[in-house]
Amino acid sequence: MKIGIIPGAGGTQRWARTAGKVRAMEAVLTGEPVRAVDAERMGLVNRVVPAGAQLEEAKRLAQQIATRPPLAVRLGKEAVNHAMEVGLAPGLEFERKLFYLLFASEDKREGMRAFLEKRPGRFTGR
């Protein structure tokens, strides 16, 4: 804004959807930078880590996700991404279909067995 343009690359659209219209409007019209702690509070970022620790934290998160059932991870990503493109009713219908698909998967059976046997699951993505 301070240099005669608005945020591009979807900035105005994503900001309004994530932080709300009022916060997005203030940020877009003033052009003032947002502090990391405020970005976290508004939901623009999911966590703030100390400077220099970003890669380590990203790897830790990736390793955690890698232990989860791959089919459920993939379909979970699809469900959340789909939610951003449609209204609530179609989003719930899409989620229900994915849930039923996962409920019939080998990974779900393995996950339930592993839980009952108090051991980590051995997931195959099927």
Language-model regions, residue ranges each:
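Crotonase-fold acyl-CoA enzyme core
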Residues: 1-73, 101-105, 110-113, 117-119, ...
